Amino acid sequence: MYHFLNLDNKTRSIMISELEQDIKNSLFYEPSSIKPEYISSYKLLLRKYFEVGHIESLEKALTPLCFKAEDKNGRKIPSNIAQTIAFSDFNRYYARAILVRAIDEGKSVSIYRAKQSLKERTESKTLVLLCNL
C-alpha cells in the first residue's frame, strides 16, 4: 500500500492538469509495453484514477489485454507490468503536482518513501536522507 501525503482534490486537480498539458503538447510518455490501440484508453484511465483513485485501483484497471506479450527485442513482458506502469505514472504526476503546488504556495517539499518496505535498500534510505538535508 502506498501513502501519498497531500493527495487531496487540489493535488489531484494539478495531476490532471499536468496530464492534459502533456497530451495537448504531445509530451505524454506512452509506455512501450502497452499495445498502441490501448493508449487512448490508458490516458482516460489515468485521468479517471488521478481524479478519484489510487495506484492500486489504476493497476487493477490495467488488464493483461492492454499489454504486448513481448518487448521490441522479443523478451517477455514481466507479469508485474501493470503494477510497474501504474506506480510509475501515478507517482510521476503526483510528484509534479506536489512541486507545482509547493511553488504556488511558497512551500518546501520533503522526500519520503510512499511505500514502506520490509527490506529497504541501504542506497534508497541514504538517498532519502540526503535529499532532506
Question: Locations of the language-model features?
Answer:
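Domain-core detector
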Residues: 1-133
